[in-house]
Amino acid sequence: MAMFRSLVASAQQRQPPAGPAGGDSGLEAQYTCPICLEVYHRPVAIGSCGHTFCGECLQPCLQVPSPLCPLCRLPFDPKKVDKATHVEKQLSSYKAPCRGCNKKVTLAKMRVHISSCLKVQEQMANCPKFVPVVPTSQPIPSNIPNRSTFACPYCGARNLDQQELVKHCVESHRSDPNRVVCPICSAMPWGDPSYKSANFLQHLLHRHKFSYDTFVDYSIDEEAAFQAALALSLSEN
């Protein structure tokens, strides 16, 4: 019996380490950033709660005085956010099938592959028409302005999405005293294109840490929309 146990133990030691649970089908989901919903890119981990995000995705959270984890909403020390080297190693080791052509690709190269995969592009072209995440009785016009990108009110830099605008203004215009119009608010139905914020950076970090387009019913006024969007954002986490 002792010899049998010894042989079993020896065989177990020679077996390669198992990959993540769930097999190939759930592999990509296990390494998906909760913010951008894509495979991690340059992942970082919050020291206190251990949650992992793409480095760029977490950046806007690091610009506020008292940052909260986007996933669990617990406060964390921005100085204790470290590069998730163990996750990076796993991204380079594990393969998963492309969601379009089913070709197996290492997770570290999945974003690049998907961006050029003809099957994925074909699927995207055939996507159903957008519908709101919250039911609404209001009609959805087809000619609404594109609120996805904005221009910097300080220097005019264009094609910035909401997170990029926050990051750009914090990094490039932190000390700029000029009063400027918020391009995000002015694009809203209730927005006043002539109203200039006395402290635009504070306004940007307070009001625009989430996307209005994801949560807002545009038929209600600004304050009601903000409160509704904030409540829905919190309820989803």
UniProtKB/Swiss-Prot annotation:
Annotated InterPro entries? Di19_Zn-bd, RNF_E3_ubiq-protein_ligase, ZF_C2HC_RNF, Znf-RING_euk, Znf_RING, Znf_RING/FYVE/PHD, Znf_RING_CS
Q: Which cysteines are joined by disulfide bonds?
A: none
Where is the signal peptide, in residue numbers? none
Respond yes or no to whether keyword Zinc-finger is given for this record.
yes
Record EC number: 2.3.2.27
Q: Which Gene3D superfamilies match?
A: Zinc/RING finger domain, C3HC4 (zinc finger)
User: Which Pfam family, an example, fits this chain?
Assistant: zf_C2HC_14
Localized where? Cytoplasm
What's any one GO cellular component for it?
cytoplasm
Q: UIM domain: from which residue to which, for each copy? A: 221-237
Its keywords, alphabetically, are:
Autophagy, Cytoplasm, Immunity, Innate immunity, Metal-binding, Transferase, Ubl conjugation pathway, Zinc, Zinc-finger
Give the reactions, separated by semicolons, that this protein catalyses: S-ubiquitinyl-[E2 ubiquitin-conjugating enzyme]-L-cysteine + [acceptor protein]-L-lysine = [E2 ubiquitin-conjugating enzyme]-L-cysteine + N(6)-ubiquitinyl-[acceptor protein]-L-lysine
Q: Which PROSITE patterns match?
A: ZF_C2HC_RNF, ZF_RING_1, ZF_RING_2
| Residue spans, zinc finger C2HC RNF-type | 98-117
- Pathway(s) it belongs to: Protein modification; protein ubiquitination
Look up the record and give one Gene Ontology term from the biological process aspect. Answer: protein polyubiquitination
**Entry GO MF terms:** ubiquitin protein ligase activity; zinc ion binding
Which positions does UniProt annotate for Zn(2+) binding? 98, 101, 113, 117
- Which parts of this protein are zinc fingers (RING-type)? 33-73
The UniProt function text for this chain reads: E3 ubiquitin-protein ligase that promotes the ubiquitination of different substrates. In turn, participates in different biological processes including interferon production or autophagy. Plays a role in the activation of RNA virus-induced interferon-beta production by promoting the ubiquitination of TRAF3 and TRAF6. Also plays a role in the early recruitment of autophagy adapters to bacteria. Mediates 'Lys-29' and 'Lys-33'-linked ubiquitination of SQSTM1 leading to xenophagic targeting of bacteria and inhibition of their replication.
Could you identify this protein by its name? E3 ubiquitin-protein ligase RNF166
Please report the organism this UniProt entry assigns to the protein. Homo sapiens
Gene name of this polypeptide:
RNF166
